[in-house]
Amino acid sequence: MTKKTVTLLVMAAGMGSRFGGLKQIEPFGPNGETILDYSVYDAASAGFGRAVIVLRRSMLADFRETVGRRIEKLLDVRYALQENDVLPAGFSVTSERARPLGTAHAVWCAREHLDTPFAVINSDDFYGGGSFGVLYGALTSPDLSACMVGYRLGNTLSETGTVNRGVCTVKNGLLVGIEERFGLDRNSGVPLDTVVSMNMWGFRPDFTDRLDRDLRAFLPAMKDPIKDELYLPGVVDGAIRDGSLSVKVLDTSEKWYGVTYREDAASLREAIKRMIAEGKYRA
């Protein structure tokens, strides 16, 4: 298989309210690199050939002038807009709604670019190079239905405050379900080697058909049209339960870094300095 047979979809339309800024273009590296710069570098090194960045229209110009110029040197980069008026024909949402419609909708908005096996990640999560390697390996396997990179809870905790995590039930290497757990830290009683989802997925192109079906069912059924969202893990869970999707859990020993809180940024900058010193990234 060639590099262009696998696509990286990056969800970058979220607002990042707790962090208090636009994390998608926040600099963390010594030369102004963002988290996404490192994710794209790791993906390109692993073998990915294309990136699809899902953004809101208001963010597009700033993003392309900063991060976009850099990552376009590494991958074939395309853009998709996640807006509340980008919907299946005949559907609409109230004009009073400001927040995006959720991560499942984000992937649906990029469907025209997803004609290859594809990975899905968050733009503001630092996943580590090894995770992209195992994900690329799975996506180039001809018998794969879908996959998820499973992190160890202890490798995803914040030193600043508690976090919410999708705790996974895994049986025979396959994902059975995900339960959202709130307020987790090292003393919350959940074993630190518990497998959790950090929204790092892999799918075949036909998964967008399932997204389309679920989005059409979700839109008229919203109880709160201002806040309700269709989440990607929820779509995956439904597909697992009805037997239409089998999700292989890929093990990673990588440490995940995020910036849930503003104070987490210093920890991430120190980690990047350390990885540069170890030769994982260029200074």
Label the model's feature ranges.
Residues 3-68, 75-77, 82:
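N-terminal glycine-rich phosphate-binding loop and ensuing alpha1 helix
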Residues 71-117:
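Short phosphate-binding loop-to-helix
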Residues 16, 126-128:
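A short, conserved beta-strand element in the Rossmann-like catalytic core
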Residues 49, 116, 145:
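Short acidic/polar active-site loop segments enriched in Thr and Asp
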Residues 116-126:
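Short beta-strand-to-loop acidic/aromatic patch adjacent to the donor-nucleotide binding site
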Residues 128-205:
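Conserved core of the sugar-phosphate nucleotidyltransferase
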Residues 63-67, 135, 211, 268:
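Hydrophobic packing residues within well-ordered alpha-helices of enzyme cores
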Residues 2-3, 171-172, 177-283:
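Conserved alpha/beta core of the MobA/IspD/sugar-nucleotide pyrophosphorylase nucleotidyltransferase superfamily
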